[in-house]
Amino acid sequence: MTSAYDKLHSTLDVKAFGRVAVLYGGKSAEREVSLKSGAAVIDALTTAGVDVVAIDVGDDLLARLQSEEIDRAFIILHGRGGEDGSMQGLLECLGIPYTGSGILASALAMDKLRTKQVWQSLGIPTPRHAVLASESDCLQASTELGFPLIVKPAHEGSSIGMAKVNSAQELVAAWQDAAKYDSQVLVEQWIHGPEFTIAVLRGQVLPPIALGTPHVFYDYDAKYIANDTQYRIPCGLDSAKEQELIDLTARACDAIGIEGWGRLDVMQDEQGRFWLLEVNTAPGMTDHSLVPMAARAAGLDFQQLVLAILAESVATRG
């Protein structure tokens, strides 16, 4: 990774990026995280000499993009309206190149159910699941999947609305809570074992990170607030298992069509088998975030990481 980036950096002219809009903030439930990510990206690009226009995305976005004469966009919006294909579609219509995955991959990755269906169709391991739309669905899932289970809104990130449940009564309550965030709610089998997160950048898989938290799972607090979350790089797997995880990550990303950069969350069960949970096409870039951590392990500082992401928009979209 370092040598590949060094080659890129040696020929990189930041002026060639033109006027870059950093799109951040927005109206999703992940707005606060996006504001922090955006501030870090804006600082890194500005320090590197890039001509940056910071746009906290609101109702005036179209007018801003047109009046500011934007040449390309760095999308650091998290959640709906930024990560789900809609922003990518707008930028495509305006002819503005942008970072990250395209319309289809963004929409697929934002939809946890569709992501799982694609992976299942290709024999890529992902936990058994059910869709919840009623109390009777909860009871049926209890019977078919057993406990413990984890409940998730289908289109939210940052672990928003998620809950681990150990009984049918808890499942009904968790479904009702998750439904406040999303009309579509999933429940998955709980995988007992360590969790890993793996970042991808410019077609390469970065060093996997093993996660440890005293929380029930790697929730919003553990991701962005708590100081007791543990991160291990190297991840502690033997070389064969780590390569298996890297290969599985590449295969899973190819199945969805991930471009530029992203991050995959994976569990390992007590038998050593890996299970894919979800993929994130615009991961966090805060001081607690995992992609910058993985990039550092690969030899890239934060500014180099941000420039590499932006440079990929030139390679893929001109």
Curated annotation (Swiss-Prot):
PROSITE patterns: ATP_GRASP, DALA_DALA_LIGASE_1, DALA_DALA_LIGASE_2. GO terms for biological process: cell wall organization; peptidoglycan biosynthetic process; regulation of cell shape. Binds 2 magnesium or manganese ions per subunit. Its EC number is 6.3.2.4. Keywords: ATP-binding, Cell shape, Cell wall biogenesis/degradation, Cytoplasm, Ligase, Magnesium, Manganese, Metal-binding, Nucleotide-binding, Peptidoglycan synthesis. GO terms for molecular function: ATP binding; D-alanine-D-alanine ligase activity; metal ion binding. Gene3D superfamilies: 3.40.50.20, ATP-grasp fold, A domain (3.30.1490.20), ATP-grasp fold, B domain (3.30.470.20). Mg(2+) 1 binds at residues 265, 278. InterPro entries: ATP-grasp (IPR011761), ATP_grasp_subdomain_1 (IPR013815), D-Ala_lig_Van_CS (IPR000291), D_ala_D_ala (IPR005905), Dala_Dala_lig_C (IPR011095), Dala_Dala_lig_N (IPR011127), PreATP-grasp_dom_sf (IPR016185). ATP binds at residues 142-197. Its cofactor is Mg(2+); Mn(2+). One of its GO terms (cellular component) is cytosol. Pathway: Cell wall biogenesis; peptidoglycan biosynthesis. SUPFAM superfamilies: Glutathione synthetase ATP-binding domain-like (SSF56059), PreATP-grasp domain (SSF52440). It is found in: Cytoplasm. Belongs to the D-alanine--D-alanine ligase family. PANTHER family: D-ALANINE--D-ALANINE LIGASE, D-ALANINE--D-ALANINE LIGASE B. Cell wall formation. This is D-alanine--D-alanine ligase.
